[in-house]
Amino acid sequence: MEKDFLGDILSVRGEFGYWVFEGDTVPAQRPSWNYRKEDDGGIIIDMLCHWRYVLDNLFGNVKSVSCLGATHIPERVDEHGKRYKATTDDAAYATFQLENGIIAHFNSSWCVRVRRDDLLTVQVDGTRASAVAGFRKCYTQHYGNTPKPVWNPDIDQPIDFFEGWSEVPEQEEFDNAFKAQWELFLKHLYTDEPFPWNLKEGAKGVQ
C-alpha cells in the first residue's frame, strides 16, 4: 500500500473464525466462559476491538460501525461435562465506514467451517490490484491479470479464479508479534520514543 500497488482502495473484507465444537461429542477448543454474557464472553467484545486497530492503522480511521451479533449454537457443554446455555454471541457481522470513504466488512464466527487460506483472511480491493492476506502469506492479483467472467449459470465455470493470483515472495523474516510490541513499549519507557498505543487507543476498540 505504501507504494500504491493497489491504487485507490475501495473496500476491505475480513473473514475470521472456525468451528468450535460444542463439547458433547468432541471437546471444545475454547473455554466455556466465551459463550456466557455474565462472564464477559462473546465474540463481539473479543474480536471487534482487533478489527478497529487493524482498520485505523492500515486503512483509515473508523467513522461508523454497524454490527449484527448472533447466537447460532444455543447450548454447549463446559469443561466439566455439564450442559449450559449460551447467553452471548458466537458470531458477528460488522460493517465499518472509514473517514476516507473506504467500506470494510468483517465476519467473525466460531460457527463456521474454514474454506480459505487461513483462519483469518483480509481481502483488499483497489483500482489497480487486489490482495488477500492471511497470517503468514499474501496473494495479489493485478489489473492486467484480472479475469473477465461472464454470467452463465447453465455451464460449468470455465475460469479457475485462484489461478490468476500470485503469492508475494518473502523478503524479510518477521519476529514474534508480541515480542515486537514489547520491544516498542520498552523503547518508549527507556528512550522516550513515541508510543501511540495507549489506554485511549485501547478504549477505542470497545466504544
Language-model features: locations:
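Juxtamembrane/interface motifs at transmembrane-helix termini
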Residues: 29, 125-126, 153-154
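C-terminal helical cap and adjacent loop that interface with cofactors, partners, or active-site loops
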Residues: 122, 132, 151-207
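Contiguous beta-strand/loop segments that form the cofactor/metal-binding neighborhood of enzyme cores
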Residues: 5, 52-145, 179-195
